[in-house]
């Protein structure tokens, strides 16, 4: 993956978000997200997957782990915003990631509407979409892209 400049990556992400009609700053592929994290020292990756997913599927080194929903009930975390504000500066560039990009989209929308001006969604998420055999980790996603992760 060719390393773009931070401003190139962020303007591409912003253009993508506008094309998709997203209310937050931008949408990045996993590879672009990793580049942004390398180029912007204050940037934070917020992994909103459940504890179970982190423990059983894998974690990203250095990510802020903050459940959007809890397993097994999948109830929304009522303290999400308070926990986010406690752990991540509202001025920071914040990248939200989940399994496939759906919960992280919701988290980015909430954060963006709550004073976080630089919210980005990691498209494809950690595991990517299901393939023709209904399995993940083969089409897109952080892990499939060969980016750093470790077993929970």
Give the location of each predicted region:
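Conserved G/P- and acidic residue-centered "switch" motifs that form tight phosphate/ATP-binding loops
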Residues: 47, 101
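Short, surface-exposed ligand- or partner-binding patches at beta-edge/loop junctions that are enriched
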Residues: 96-97
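Rhodanese-like catalytic fold shared by cysteine-dependent sulfurtransferases
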Residues: 2-43, 51-93, 104-152
């Amino acid at each position: 993956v060719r390393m773009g400049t931070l401003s190139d990556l962020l303007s591409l992400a912003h253009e993508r978000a506008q094309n998709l009609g997203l209310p937050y700053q931008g949408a990045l592929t996993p590879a672009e997200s990793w580049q942004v994290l390398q180029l912007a020292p204050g940037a934070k990756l917020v992994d909103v997957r459940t504890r179970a997913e982190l423990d059983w599927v894998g974690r990203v080194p250095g990510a802020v782990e903050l459940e959007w929903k809890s397993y097994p009930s999948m109830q929304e975390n009522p303290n999400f915003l308070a926990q986010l504000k406690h752990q991540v500066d509202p001025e920071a560039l914040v990248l939200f990631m989940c399994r496939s990009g759906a919960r992280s989209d919701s988290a980015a929308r909430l954060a963006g509407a709550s004073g976080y001006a630089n919210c980005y969604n990691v498209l494809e998420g950690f595991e990517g979409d299901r393939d023709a055999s209904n399995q993940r980790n083969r089409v897109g996603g952080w892990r499939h892209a060969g980016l750093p992760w470790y077993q929970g």
